[in-house]
Amino acid sequence: MSVASQSLNSSSAGSALVELVDVVKVYATAAGEFTALKGINMQVGRGEFVGVIGKSGAGKSTLLNMITGVDHLTSGEVVVNSNGSPVSIHKMSEDQIALWRGHNLGVVYQSFQLLPMLTLVENITLPMDLCGRFNPKQSRERALELLRLVEIEDQADKLPAHISGGQQQRVAIARALANDPPILVADEPTGSLDSVTSEHIFEVFEHLVSELGKTIIMVTHDQSLAPRFTRALRIADGELVHSEQSEEGMR
């Protein structure tokens, strides 16, 4: 059995929340075509904390971009079954993808990407207001609840510049949860943080999976995190080369 088939079968087909089928991504460069993803097949089940581990340039971020729909795939398919109705992401228009993503997917970046002119609580209410899921009073109450979840509620009315990098990442996680999406994707969320802060952030993700039932797909270059995920996938040169189940991450 190939590595791609192993990773595809490691979650049962009936419970797959996210499925990638023969996903290929080719970029046109001055030096010619560059294939960033080479026929990726994988499934992610509900409630999994999946780590995609690889070196810089291995294709980790490109893989996340295919799942979130922020970039076009060259061939293949990405299917997400978040509410009982499977959606083929790349068959939707960009406007449809943006609306779908707002309700179904939370994204956490390494660089936080908080809006500097808005307070922390306003950064979290903004995606709620854009999706129209809550009225203004409900939005603020929910934002404060999410800040409480990531243990930074007392900083709610500060601007991002007035808190630390680790605190900003906590706010970014709260913002990703704003519309209560079933799926979070995280692109090197601890990459710019010190080891102690990184551990705190990772514990937040573990809590979201174990206590709130979220499904998380996280890419990282940090090999030492592999045992902490429920499943770790290794990516190199645009291909999945290894898949391993973790006893520690499953506890």
Q: Predicted segment positions?
A:
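ABC family nucleotide-binding domain
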Residues: 15-235
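ABC-family P-loop ATPase nucleotide-binding domain
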Residues: 1-26, 242-251
